Amino acid sequence: MEQSFLPIRCALISVSDKTGIFSLAKNLIKHKVKLITTSGTYKYLLEKGIFSTSVSEYINHPEIINGRVKTLHPKIHGGILSNNKNINENKNLNIKKIDMVITNFYPFKKKVKKENIKIENIIDNIDIGGVALARSAAKNYKYVTVVVNINQYSKLSSEMDKNSGSVSFKTRFYFSTLAFQYSYSYDKEIFNYFNKIYFKEIELKKNLKNKKFPELFSISFSKKEDVLYGENYHQKAAFYTDPVIHPGTVPFSIQRQGKKLSYNNIVDSDIAINCVMNFSEIACVIVKHSTPCGVSSGKNIIDAYRSAYYSDPDSAFGGIISFNRPLTIEAAEFIINKQFVEIIIAPVIEKDALLTLKSKSKIIVLECGYLSKNFLLNFKKVNCGLLLQDSDNKILKEKDIKIVSKRQPSKLEIESSIFIWKIIKFIKSNAIIYGKNKRTLGIGSGQTSRIFSTRIAAYKAIDQGFSLKGSVMASDAFFPFRDSIDFASKFGVSCIIQPGGSINDDKIISAVDENNMSMIFTNTRQFSH
């Protein structure tokens, strides 16, 4: 039966992060605890006037392989794993009972975050001995106290002071749980590194090409920060990030000013960055409630912003504005004089622009960098499961399209069609976009009927005073019936871009021809659920 309170007589200390260890060691000595320490910890404490027994002295064997093997020894693990049943065995082998293990591991995660670091340096930061110590001690929680979290040092000291140098069973069990969690997270970080970085996703690319996904999929994220609340005020939330962070993403972004990002801010900013980075030409995207409400290209970012804003100024109020070019002082002044804005995002924020924005200190300003890579995987959590798919990174080019109508679209119609097609995958299905001259005129999203999205997008455009004559229309999926074609024709739409693939394609094409319109097939559906 476990001891309710365990007197601590001997503690093994092996820590990479030595924060707080001096104060804890002093408290242990106050309670007459014998200290056994590994070389780095031994030297650190000795310099501060605390004497201990080195592991090498205790086991009568030097550290070997440049310190890679220090504590992997029967006298260490025999002392940690022993219980009341094997006291005599340990006594005959001159193995002392170790009542406490204080350890933390090599800083693997910090090394991984550094760019261009060699694999050899990463390997040297994979802890073996510390992990073994923590697991041995956690396994034997009935007879050993294990501490892996520097934030628990004060709790440990307080408990020992209160209980004359002893630790309660409840605390030992809690600390063992933390140790297993720490070890688990550490191993996942290592796995993710080898899976994502060392193999540089070659195997993943090959497997995805062959439509193969791993039998076991494991992910590990680290908490960056708590956010004020979740999607709604009554929900709690936190923001976690990938072990490796790339430019052109929200986690990579530097917040130059403004209040703390909310849950919804992060979601909307991610969509805004992803959408605007699809374009090689100068572009601006305005997002509201996870949906682009205005997107435009232009000869400069002010021109692009102006057109995006006037696509739907009502929805743009309090929205997220994202650019794929540096934010200039002229653009910053134009925006703050035009509308109330929640967030402004650009790959670079020029100094003068930031000085101008400081007059509106509540505006969140994110400098996100330029997108450096396409991400291979996309996943969505469902209750008790995870859906995994390869990311939709396909960018439509003119050589990929198929013109299926009698009327041939003009060069400008093709360019505008491809432009709005790049946006459609960021609009919730059923999605319809009207556009012209590389800008959106009206967006219909999230309707369970395609004809309703077609109508909503048109009414939005008309409400802003736009004429749809000579405009283009994009649909994220095929048209099951001709009703949307006939509706668009009434407003003068001249070209439609859609995936095709309906059993009624022939009827749809006939409707297009009857209305003297052009139709482009992309052969790629762009659902967003």
From Swiss-Prot:
<dbReference type="GO" id="GO:0006189">
    <property type="term" value="P:'de novo' IMP biosynthetic process"/>
</dbReference>
<protein>
    <recommendedName>
        <fullName>Bifunctional purine biosynthesis protein PurH</fullName>
        <ecNumber>2.1.2.3</ecNumber>
        <ecNumber>3.5.4.10</ecNumber>
    </recommendedName>
</protein>
<dbReference type="Pfam" id="PF02142">
    <property type="entry name" value="MGS"/>
</dbReference>
<dbReference type="InterPro" id="IPR024051">
    <property type="entry name" value="AICAR_Tfase_dup_dom_sf"/>
</dbReference>
<dbReference type="InterPro" id="IPR016193">
    <property type="entry name" value="Cytidine_deaminase-like"/>
</dbReference>
<dbReference type="GO" id="GO:0005829">
    <property type="term" value="C:cytosol"/>
</dbReference>
<comment type="pathway">
    <text>Purine metabolism; IMP biosynthesis via de novo pathway; IMP from 5-formamido-1-(5-phospho-D-ribosyl)imidazole-4-carboxamide: step 1/1.</text>
</comment>
<feature type="domain" description="MGS-like">
    <location>
        <begin position="1"/>
        <end position="148"/>
    </location>
</feature>
<keyword id="KW-0658">Purine biosynthesis</keyword>
<keyword id="KW-0808">Transferase</keyword>
<dbReference type="InterPro" id="IPR036914">
    <property type="entry name" value="MGS-like_dom_sf"/>
</dbReference>
<comment type="pathway">
    <text>Purine metabolism; IMP biosynthesis via de novo pathway; 5-formamido-1-(5-phospho-D-ribosyl)imidazole-4-carboxamide from 5-amino-1-(5-phospho-D-ribosyl)imidazole-4-carboxamide (10-formyl THF route): step 1/1.</text>
</comment>
<keyword id="KW-0511">Multifunctional enzyme</keyword>
<dbReference type="InterPro" id="IPR002695">
    <property type="entry name" value="PurH-like"/>
</dbReference>
<dbReference type="Pfam" id="PF01808">
    <property type="entry name" value="AICARFT_IMPCHas"/>
</dbReference>
<dbReference type="InterPro" id="IPR011607">
    <property type="entry name" value="MGS-like_dom"/>
</dbReference>
<comment type="similarity">
    <text>Belongs to the PurH family.</text>
</comment>
<keyword id="KW-0378">Hydrolase</keyword>
<dbReference type="GO" id="GO:0003937">
    <property type="term" value="F:IMP cyclohydrolase activity"/>
</dbReference>
<dbReference type="GO" id="GO:0004643">
    <property type="term" value="F:phosphoribosylaminoimidazolecarboxamide formyltransferase activity"/>
</dbReference>
